[in-house]
From Swiss-Prot:
It comes from Salmonella paratyphi A (strain AKU_12601). Pathway: Bacterial outer membrane biogenesis; enterobacterial common antigen biosynthesis. This is UDP-N-acetyl-D-mannosaminuronic acid transferase. GO terms for molecular function: lipopolysaccharide N-acetylmannosaminouronosyltransferase activity. HAMAP family: WecG_RffM. One of its GO terms (biological process) is enterobacterial common antigen biosynthetic process. Catalyzes the synthesis of Und-PP-GlcNAc-ManNAcA (Lipid II), the second lipid-linked intermediate involved in enterobacterial common antigen (ECA) synthesis. NCBIfam families: PRK03692.1 (NF002980), wecG_tagA_cpsF (TIGR00696). Keywords: Glycosyltransferase, Transferase. It is an enzyme of class 2 (transferase). Belongs to the glycosyltransferase 26 family. It catalyses: UDP-N-acetyl-alpha-D-mannosaminouronate + N-acetyl-alpha-D-glucosaminyl-di-trans,octa-cis-undecaprenyl diphosphate = beta-D-ManNAcA-(1->4)-alpha-D-GlcNAc-di-trans,octa-cis-undecaprenyl diphosphate + UDP + H(+). Its EC number is 2.4.1.180. It comes from the Bacteria.
Amino acid sequence: MTNNAAAPLYSLRGLPLIGWRDMSHALNYLFADGQLKQGTLVAINAEKLLTAEDNPEVRALIGAAEFKYADGISVVRSIRKKFPQAQVSRVAGADLWEALMARAGKEGTPVFLVGGKPEVLAQTEAKLRTQWNVNIVGSQDGYFTPEQRQALFARIHASGAKIVTVAMGSPKQELLMRDCREVHPHALYMGVGGTYDVFTGHVKRAPKIWQNLGLEWLYRLLSQPKRITRQMRLLRYLRWHYTGDL
């Protein structure tokens, strides 16, 4: 019998990554025995592995997160190459966030949203309430000063949120989640980057066929040619992958 509440770990470049078989497995893992796990979720793709390799602070932030999972198809392929018996599939961060919100709405789990432009955040809240009846106990857009951080953490703690999602981009969101956990430790935190923009239709995601073929990165590159410099960094990751240096 398969244990859906457990998941193997696979090490890439010294970082242990959770190997989920599919979205159902991910949700059963996070809500094992009906209890939502506490800690920090971090989506790992090739670009994030490269940044962690070059930036000790980012590596420490990622390393400290309890739940690191394979978000990028290149990372999934590397796991399968290094561990041929691995039954692991890509769980995209944007999809996991939506599934988590749907589950939270069903179970009445209190949610606090952080990040995004004010209008995008407001639309995100409205859509979450309408679509899944999510119990949003507070929110804060991404426009606040360093001096306002502690007040935000106090608000999150007072809200009793069990899920806190932060859309600020990496590593800003990881830094904020780390610091907020010192004030409000008993929650599941998730860094979600530009997910609110995609969810509300402000940014178009790659069509499903591109996603299924593992070409979402190419779609983004064609849509945003200025990303070419960032994509060139991935040649280094390809060297790791094909030389087995993972």
